[in-house]
Amino acid sequence: MSKLNVTNARRKTRVRIALRRTANGRPRLSVFRSSKHIYAQVIDDLKGETLASASSLEKSLRDAGNTGANIDAAKAVGKLLAERAVQQGVKEVVFDRGGYLYHGRVKALADAARESGLSF
């Protein structure tokens, strides 16, 4: 692995360990962003299962004209994920930014999820 990949992997692990300490049984809202799309899911780490998920690859979001690589798509994914999570009975989560900076698409997704009913 290159030094950059090692550094990113360590950062991701460090963030996840800190989240486990402060989670207190709350599910984790995990974000993955690629150069073209953004993905998010609410995970119950105690049971090891995904409670809700959304991504910019979904047909309903692609038909809206969002490419997935912009802030508007991240907002749409955050809103959709929050609606699905609230429907499953999840109101409080721990935000796992996955080592990404809390800026741009990651911040837009988090803000949209907050506005749609999730608290973190």
UniProtKB/Swiss-Prot annotation:
Pfam families: Ribosomal_L18p
GO annotation (BP), single: translation
Keywords assigned: Ribonucleoprotein, Ribosomal protein, RNA-binding, rRNA-binding
GO MF terms held by the record: 5S rRNA binding; structural constituent of ribosome
Domain of life, per lineage: Bacteria
GO cellular component, one term: cytosolic large ribosomal subunit
Subunit structure: Part of the 50S ribosomal subunit; part of the 5S rRNA/L5/L18/L25 subcomplex. Contacts the 5S and 23S rRNAs.
Family: Belongs to the universal ribosomal protein uL18 family.
Stated role: This is one of the proteins that bind and probably mediate the attachment of the 5S RNA into the large ribosomal subunit, where it forms part of the central protuberance.
Stated name of the protein: Large ribosomal subunit protein uL18
Species whose genome carries this gene: Rhodopseudomonas palustris (strain BisB5)
Gene that encodes it: rplR
